[in-house]
């Protein structure tokens, strides 16, 4: 984890409770009034203006690289920051390889990022695995994102997926399937359906790696939501369409361990990680297929 990431993590966790509650109550009010889309458009414009020169300078350092349009970048990562997108994606790809180490032979491995967005991680994974003959795939349910990925990112096979299973692959097709902040935008029913589907498309002894908005994201919750969270229930904010950035799900470790994982008898939890990062401060879970 970089120094700036450590600082950001500390700042998030150390915010005064009154400040946290005020912000979350404001967001909840805007959600009820249907004003979040307007606010999001304004925030997007402000992010573009704020980072325009910085992004221009960073892109000049990598003249052969293509960076995603601001709307795609913001929709997937809530940022319009090329350095965060590119360098953060590289670190996440390296973290993913560390999570695989000791379980999956990289040589010739077939790996899928489910919900790849504009290729923040998968573009680097394709490069890191090129010499070992790794086959890299990405799926997403946003058509504009997939079209951009296909036109801009070499070395990765991109395919559409739906909001609901199945994935367009046969049983046991992949050695690893991973997702970064995808379950965090799904209903409880889709948690169970998609984890089962993830395990379907990996080989026996293959890995399913996913992230959740757990204890480090607890500060975002309102008092009533905290009670659900602490009771081991999934907390879901459902006003926007499922799968959209503002459709938010928060998963306590108790929910994952005692409700989600027991729903897949062919999956075995082998690692719960809070040090490495695939999606900011989200917790990482590594499940091995029996």
Enumerate the predicted regions with their spans.
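Surface-exposed loop/turn positions
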Residues: 109, 173, 205-206
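A short acidic, Gly/Pro-enriched loop at the edge of an enzyme's catalytic core
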Residues: 165-177
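Soluble, non-transmembrane catalytic domains of enzymes that act on hydrophobic metabolites at membranes
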Residues: 2-6
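Class I (Rossmann-like) S-adenosyl-L-methionine-dependent methyltransferase catalytic domain
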Residues: 9-24, 28, 32-109, 114, ...
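A short SAM/SAH-binding and catalytic strip from SAM-dependent methyltransferases
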Residues: 176-189
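A short glycine-rich, Lys/Arg-flanked "PGG" loop and its adjoining helix->strand segment in the class I
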Residues: 192-204
């Amino acid at each position: 984890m970089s120094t700036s990431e450590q600082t950001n993590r500390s700042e998030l966790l150390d915010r005064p409770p009154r400040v946290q509650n005020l912000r979350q109550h404001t967001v909840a009010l805007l959600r009820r009034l249907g004003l979040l889309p307007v606010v999001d458009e304004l925030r997007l414009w402000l992010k573009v203006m704020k980072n325009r020169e910085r992004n221009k300078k960073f892109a000049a350092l990598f003249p052969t690289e293509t960076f995603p349009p601001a709307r795609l970048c913001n929709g997937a990562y809530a940022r319009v920051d090329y350095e965060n997108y590119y360098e953060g994606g590289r670190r996440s790809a390296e973290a993913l390889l560390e999570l695989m180490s000791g379980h999956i032979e990289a040589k010739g491995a077939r790996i899928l990022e489910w919900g790849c967005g504009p290729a923040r991680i998968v573009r680097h994974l394709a490069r890191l695995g090129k010499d070992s003959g790794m086959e890299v795939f990405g799926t997403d349910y946003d058509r504009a994102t997939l079209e951009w990925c296909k036109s801009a990112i070499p070395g990765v096979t991109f395919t559409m997926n739906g909001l609901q299973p199945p994935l367009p692959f046969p049983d046991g097709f992949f050695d690893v399937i991973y997702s970064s902040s995808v379950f965090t935008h799904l209903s409880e029913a889709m948690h169970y359906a998609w984890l089962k589907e993830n395990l379907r498309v990996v080989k026996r002894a293959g890995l399913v790696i996913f992230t959740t908005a757990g204890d480090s994201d607890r500060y975002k919750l309102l008092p009533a939501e905290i009670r659900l969270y602490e009771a081991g229930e999934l907390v879901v904010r459902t006003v926007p369409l499922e799968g959209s950035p503002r459709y938010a799900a928060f998963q306590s470790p108790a929910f994952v361990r005692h409700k989600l994982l027991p729903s897949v008898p062919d999956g075995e939890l082998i690692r719960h990680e809070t040090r490495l990062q695939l999606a900011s401060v989200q917790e990482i879970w590594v499940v091995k297929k029996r």
